[in-house]
Structure formats: structure tokens, C-alpha cells
UniProtKB/Swiss-Prot annotation:
Domain PH: start-end pairs: 18-125
Stretches assigned to coiled coil: 569-693
Stated role: Acts as a GTPase activator for the Rac-type GTPase by converting it to an inactive GDP-bound state.
GO molecular function, one term: GTPase activator activity
Pfam families (UniProt xref): Lzipper-MIP1, PH, RhoGAP
Basic and acidic residues bias: start-end ranges: 777-787
Residue intervals of the Rho-GAP domain: 167-367
This protein's name: Rho GTPase-activating protein 7
Organism: Arabidopsis thaliana (Mouse-ear cress)
Amino acid sequence: MEASLAALERPRGSASNTVFKSGPLFISSKGLGWTSWKKRWFILTRTSLVFFKNDPGTLPQKGGEVNLTLGGIDLNNSGSVVVREDKKLLTVLFPDGRDGRAFTLKAETFEDLYEWKTALEQALAQAPNAALIMGQNGIFRAETNEAIEGREKRPLKSLVVGRPILLALEDIDGSPSFLEKALQFIEKYGTKIEGILRQSADVEEVERRVQEYEQGKTEFTFDEDPHVVGDCIKHVLRELPSSPVSASCCTALLEAYRIESKEARISSLRSAIAETFPEPNRRLLQRILKMMHTISSHSHENRMNPNAVAACMAPLLLRPLLAGECDLEDDFDGGEDNSAQLLAAANAANNAQAIITVLLEDYGSIFDEENIQRCSISTESHIGNSGPDDSSDDDNNMKNGYHNADNEVEPVTDDDNDRALSGKMSESSGCTGSDLYEYKGFVADDSDIESPRDTNGPRCNSNIRTDHLMRNPFVNSTDQQAGEQIGDDPTKYGVNSCLAHVSESYQQSGTGLNVPTHGNTLAAPGLESPSAKSVNKGTPSSVHAKRATFWGRGSARKISTDGSFDSSGEDELAIQRLETTKNELRQRIAKEARGNAILQASLERRKQALHERRLSLEQDVSRLQEQLQAERDLRAALEVGLSMSSGQFSSHGVDSKTRAELEEIALAEADVARLKQKVAELHHQLNQQRQTHFGSFSDARDTHQYLQNHNPQKRFLQQDFDSTLAYVNHERKQRHEENVLGAEWRNSKGAGSFGVGNSRQPSRKQIPESTNTTDSKISEESGKISVDKLSSIDSPSIPSTSRVLDITEYPRLNHPSAAASAALVELTTRLDFFKERRSQLMEQLQNLDLNYGGSSSQDFIHRPSSPPWN
């Protein structure tokens, strides 16, 4: 803290510098060139409030780097503290002086806010008396050491930086200024440099080049670095006392840019520049845009298109827009994390870049001199209206150059020095004198004024301006308010200029305009004839009249010869304002109507789509309901059919197709039951026959063996029997295969029952034919056996094939019981075949016994038996 106390030493006294509080606060000052809140370290004592870039007690001291005091204010016991809790703002007010002082700071937290408030109240209570303090200025000094520590200070009045806008492009002698030469150099040598105006140069080189220009090196050579010269242009624009485009002009450009139609937007931008821009500001903006347009036209070489160039130069040209002085109609609310401020700053930067981009892309259309209508104030017209005495005075002024103008400005600068330095932190110090200097040069120099080529365009009417002056006889304003009127509302720049001419003309005609300063009342005596002239323009009263009229503090009352007031000027201004408002309202109404039409069309399309969707869904629901009802009816019918027994179903509520299927199912069930009963009976009969004939067959074999051993002739019979038995086996296999094929054929065709019965007759006839080959006698006897007789044996117990086919033909083959019926048919066919073969074998055995039995076998009683089938 010793370092802090050492830094607080001031040469004005040895009063106690007790530290009441120290800590960080946020400071914002447009006068210092800051566009946002910056955090600084503040130290509060009984006599002053100073701030540093960092905490002087903890900052490590590097070699040669000193944490100097960046600024501060002197305190006295007349100050007061005002707190705004919603934004955590802390304002220190001083009613002393002619204008008063106000300093606004911002705390990080509410706790810091109230701590600083308490400390400031204590310090102000112990501060020196305001009447005893002599020569205080109480202004936050410029932060000269923020960019470069320890660099040399420039002269108080630089030849390059800090010059008024009127002298930005031309010097007093009419020669090109530093800025104009730099612009010409960039247009000549910088168009092919990649990244020109975007790539930054060394700050020290830029400062060195400015100092060299001030020291005599006033020309730019081809071997200089274009990036350094480009940064010199930015440096000069940044150090201008006021923005090249004021706040009201930025607002006009912003409103014109928001128009959707391109042609209307260009026309509105042209009108905004012609109507709201003062002539020096318009010429400066047009010159800089011309250089930027030249660079962007070579974008294929330098890679700087209009958008890129606008991004680099927009913050320098539209400073009020980025500083938040223009209404962007955004809804960003301040928050604790400053996110809303960041969003608002980004929105402002985007709008500024977009406006400059449009001005570059349509440069030829917007800055067409034939289309620009501006208020022209020329010294030639003033000389013509003033008479020969004014001409002599103007000639005297031209001979002396701007010496008289400087002399007239100098008292204002000296007189208002303290007030200029004691302005609010949100205003630029030193701006008032420079603006007045701009005005003097603007009025006296014919080279800076271009007469409009359109003779029908609007011109300044001295009568209208005088009326406006006369109707405001009592105007109490300070230098700060006057600076705001000229700097922030350039729409009145031409009005004030015309008022200056009117004031001078009235002074020359002998009219007494006693212009008050700082709240004095105004006396307006009767006006003499305009033909009476007064040549003394160099008197102090004349100087004060000019200055007061320019700043808006002077006023007069124009009275006609009959004593009445002329209100035509006020009515004309009111009509213009109403016309402007009407046009704006029409544009807004048209915009809203277009938006409503789009929304209405979108709503109709959505309504139609929803209606179509509704109809489609209704159709789907109806179709599905019908399908569901049909499925339910079918299910009920099937359940009824399954639950009923055969032959007992009711036809009520059942369609013909379902009824036919149910009848078919009932018949199939009856057939299956009957066939099952038949199979059971056949199995029972077969078992009985096997048991009955098994013993007879064994006796027959013994008899044949006996005959073979005793009778040689029986060997032949035995051989014939064996061949017959083999033939029977072969025939059995063949019949089995035929039955299988017949069953398959019946399943596929559902017919052919008669063919099967007929096909068996040749097979039955082949049996006697095969026996004829062995013995002619046996053949003769066996040939007498009729096939019908063989087939008639045991006919009551054996169903014919045709009967079986008739039974199996009844049910449909595609019914689920068709497979069971086919199996039963095959089984029945096999049983018939076995019975027939058994009958044939029994007949053959009987014939053999009769023919070859002899006397020894007469007593033998043959008992037929079934052969042992393998």
C-alpha cells in the first residue's frame, strides 16, 4: 500500500491522504474512446478518487514499467452520491462550477456497491471546502499509458491527429492533409496487398510515421509499408474529436437499411445521407468509402471483398452505433454475467458491418452527385446577400487566411477549458472547441463547399431559419448541451449555420442582438431596415453574437412591420415532420400487411392439409369397422358349426357357402365312423379265419411230403405247387404296387372305380394260363375253372372293389378326412385280394387231391387252410 500512497502524492497541497477504500470498479467513458465498461483499480482518499490499470500494491514491477495513475477526480464537500441498485451504478455529483460534474462507476456486486457508497460519503464529508479549492479541473485524465508504457507525449495540438472533421481531408492552406495523402497511397499501392486494412502493423511504427510527418516528412513514398499507412488511417479516424457519422446519422442509416426492397433501400440511404449529414461529414464518409470501394474492387488480388473491408472500417465510421447510442430495437435484458451486453454489442457490430457493406456495393448509386439533394451553404450566396461592405470584410478575412478565425476561437477555447474538461464521462473532452473551429472553417472556406447541381433541390431559407430563431427567445444551455446539439443532432447543423449568417447580417444592418451567456435573458430591440449596414464585425459583441448563435444559446425575435409574428416556417417544419411520420407509418403498415398475408396463406394451407387428412382417416376407420364386423360374423358362424352335431345345425343366420361346408363336414364324419366300424369287423373275421385254417394247412403240407416220398409223380405236383406258390407271391407284390398306384390316382382324380374292377379280370385269367405250360392235363382241368366262380367264393363276406370305390368316392378329396378315407380304401383292397387268393389256392389244392390222390388218398379229407404268408 506504500506504493499506492506514493502514487497519490499531488503537488497542490500537503493534506492528509488517508485511504478510505481501495478496490476494483468499472469505468466507461466515451471521451476516453472506450465503448464498454473497463475494470480499473480505484483508491479513495479525502481529497481525490484516482484509478490505476492494476492494483499498485500487488503488481510486479518489471524493468522500466511503472503503474502510473491513469486518472482521477478531485473531491470537495459539495459532492453527493447516487446509487442505482438495478444496474449497480454509483454516481458522484458535484454542483460546483457552471455546469456541474457527474461521474458514473459500476460495482461488481451489491456488497461492493454499498461499501463504496459509504466510503464515498465519508470522504466527501471530510473533503476540503469547494470555495477554498482553486484551479481544480476534476476530470478523468486520458489513459495515455494504456497502449504504450512510457512513450513520449505529443504536442498539445497535433498536426495529424485530433483535428476537426472539416480539416480531416484538407489543411488550412487547401493542401491535402495527412489522411488524404494516406488514402491516395492506399489506392495507388495497397490494392494488390493481401489483407490490406485487415492485417495490423506495429503500433510503434505507426506512431513513428505520424511523428515523422509532423517533423517534415509529409509525403508517402512507394517503398513504405501499406499496412503501416493503413493503420495510420485508422489511427487518424479513431482520434477524431467526433465520429465521422454522428448518432442521428447512424439512426437514419439504420432505418434506411431496414427497408426490404433494394431500390427503396438505396433511395432511402441516398436521402438519409443528403438530408441528415453535415457537408464535412458527408465528404469525409464519401472519401473513405471511395478508398474502400477501390480496395474491394481488387478482391481477387488482396482477398478483401466488401464484407471484409466493412468489417475492418465499420467500427471507426459508425462509432455511435457500436457505442449503444442508437436504438436497435433489441430485447436484450441486462444480466449478472453481462451476456445481454455481449449480445447487444454483437448485434450492433453486425448492423454496422451490413450498412457499410451496402454502401460499398452500391457506392455508384448512392453517391451520385446528380441524385444527392443537400442543403448548400456557400459564402458566395452570403456575400451576395450581405452587400458591398460584407465583401470588403470577407476579403479582409481571406487575406488573413484563418488567422481571424483562430483568434475568434481562441477565447472560446480558453474560456471553456475548464467546462470542457469537467464534462460527463460519457462525453468527449475538447470536442466543443474543435467543432467551433470546424464551423469557422466551414463558413469561410469556399473550397470546402460544393454548390448543388440540381437548382430545384432544397436550399436554406434564411427567413425560415430566422423564424425558428425568433420563436425561441429564451434559451439557457451550456457548452456541453450545445456540443450534444451539434455533435449528436447533425440535422440541425445546416440550421445553425444559416442562423450564423442571419445573425451576422442583422449585426451588419445595425440590429442589436444582445446574446446572453449562461442563463442571462435576451433583449430584442426593434429591428431597423435591412438596408442599413454595420461594418464592424471584429468587435467583441459581434464575436459573442456569432458564437452564441452557433451554439444555439442566442435567439432573436423576428417581428414584421405590422407587429405580427410569421409562423410559416414553423408550419412548414411541422408539415415535413408529419409527412415523414406518414411515410414511415405507411412503410410499417405495408410490411405488416405482407407478413400477415404470408401467415394467412400458410394458415390456409395447413387448414386444407388437416381437412384432407381428416377425410382420409374417416374413410380408413369406416373400412376397418366393416372388416371387423365381417370377421366377427364369420367367427360366430364357425363356432356355431363346430358346436353342432352332424345333421342338427340350423340355417338361421348362416350363408349358403358356410352351410354347404358344414353339411360336407357332417357327411365326412359319418363316413369315417362307418369305415372304422368296417375295419374293425374285417380284422375280427381275418383273425378267425387264420385260426381256423392254420391246422388244415399244416396237414396238407404233411400229405404233400408223404406223396413226394412214395409217389414219383407227386414230385411233379410238388414242383408245380412251388411254381404256383412263387407266382402267387409275385402276383401279390404286383397287386400291392397296383393298389398303391391306384390309391394315388384315386386321390388325384377322384374317379376310376370301374377301371380297377375291370383291370383285375385279366390278372385273374393269367393264373390258369401259367399253369398250362407245365402240364397239359392240369391246364385242361384248370382252364375249366371260371374266374367268376373264383370271384364268387365267399362273396357275401367280401366287398367288391367297386363298392369300396363307391364308398370312398363320396367325400371330397380336398377335405381333411380324405387321407383317412384313402388309407381305409387301401386296407380294404388288400383284404379283398387276400381273400381271393385264398379261395384260388383252396380250389387248386382240392383239384390236385382229386386228380393225383389215387386210392391211398381216398380216405384223406382235405381241410382248407390259409397259406403261410410271409
